[in-house]
Amino acid sequence: MISLRRTARNILIVGSSHISVWVATFAFTVVQARYLDPSRFGQLALALAYAAFLLIFVDFGTSTLVSRTVAQRRDEQRSVIAATLLIRSVLWLVALPFLLLVSLVLGYDADLVRAILVLAIATLFVSWGGAVTAYLLGREEFLLPSLSMSAYRIVAAIVGIAILVLVPTPSLYLIACAFLIGAMVSAGLLFYALRGQTAIAWQIEPRRAVALLRSALPIGAYLVVGTFYFNVDLVMLEGMAPAENVGWYAAAYRLFKNATLVEAIVVARVLYPVFSRMSLGPQEELRVVIAKAMSFLAILGAAVVLLFVLCADGIVGILYSTDAYAPTANALRLLAPGLFFLYLNSVVCNALFALGYEKRLLVMAAVFAVLNVSANLLAIPRFMEDGAAAVTTLTEVGLLLWLTRLAPRDLLTGETARTVAKAGAAAVIAGVMVVLSGANTLLAMVPLALLAYGVAIVALRTIGPADLASIADLFGAGRPRRPATVPLGQPVHEEIAKSS
């Protein structure tokens, strides 16, 4: 199927271009943990959580709506970027005083408040760049958004690492400046590349902006509520536990978030515009793409969970400091299964957004916001960071159950459910084999776990012959193809040269 092959190739190439982003993010996180004690590391994570929530509020669903609208009716959206920029600028100006007021009311120290302010300014630049990115992704143009995201993460990492290494006891405010510089470079790259584009109308049309915001309201409300219950645990932990516990949980959660990069590339970057385009036609091709995406992410997600659960102590010891961050390992083990369900949830949720299910998804998010906060109120006082981690995983399980009930009956197939179950079973089998082997070092556990997992995947026939043939074709093992050229700045379907 041509669209499936194109989608798989786009995922591969966009994913390859984001390896540098992953490396830069991990390196910056490791250096932060090495040069900051757990309490200050936790404060920085808290500031980043506020910035993430602000970004979602400023976006307010416009990225999702713009990508979907452009994918479905691309020739009618010349002024959509200007309208999106106006919406985001106004929402940022409205939200900033409330953000600073909350910081002062909660009694944060001056350094943390300044860091939150700097990250808020960085968020404005990220949101401006995101407006352009949403438009380009809707056109299935991936080169420029990938370069922009890489520039943001790499520049922020380089500047941040330099500050941490060269400045004795750097302030959180100074570290936050690294993110601001990266955001400015990223946004500047996008707007410079689009200068002189006649296909884009830059004049401000307030009525168009109001209409766009009105259409985005259900999506924006969903994203705000969803971001709330995925970041509120860190805020609650900061108010209910010692600073060290906040740092331990933040360290585990940063690894958890970094591991979602694959999901962000596969689904948010590549698949969502495809889902939106396919939603206008027959459901068969959409169903096939969803099935293949869920199978791929289930197999990959189970492998990540396997390594995190088995190797948590070793990972924490290498990336952080065993003495200062030892409790992080158990929190990471409790968070890890949530990745498996998060990968699956992302596919179903984005498909439902493409089909226009945002109002039903908002109801789901509101219910889980109440459940998540209630569960954290019970778990954090008794289990601290471990309780917050367990609640995160249980939330993902509940979301998957709700989403599968919400999706149309013909959208998810029994074959996909069997593949997901087999991937989970293969991870359990591999984990038991590694434990029984007595291996206790990363050098021994990682290859043994992956080998055992691969054998179990094959033995359980998790991947069928047709899938293996598709993978072989994807990597060029099939019949030779004539190389294709990719015109810069044009819609790309055959070949391809992703926020705090």
Task: Tell me what each language-model feature is.
Residues 103-119, 308-340:
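Interfacial segments at transmembrane-helix termini and the short loops linking adjacent helices
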Residues 25, 58-75, 138, 252, ...:
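Helix-loop junctions and terminal segments of transmembrane helices
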Residues 3-63, 96, 100-103, 122, ...:
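Signature of the first transmembrane helix
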Residues 23, 368-371, 416-470, 487-489, ...:
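Transmembrane alpha-helical segments of multi-pass transport proteins
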Residues 1-7, 172-178, 188-230, 270, ...:
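Interhelical loop/hinge segments that connect adjacent transmembrane helices in multipass membrane
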Residues 1-24, 75-78, 82, 111-112, ...:
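N-terminal membrane topogenesis motif
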Residues 33-41, 110-113, 117, 139-147, ...:
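Membrane-interface helix-loop junctions in multi-pass transport and translocation proteins
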Residues 88-225, 230-231:
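Hydrophobic transmembrane helix module of multi-pass membrane transport proteins
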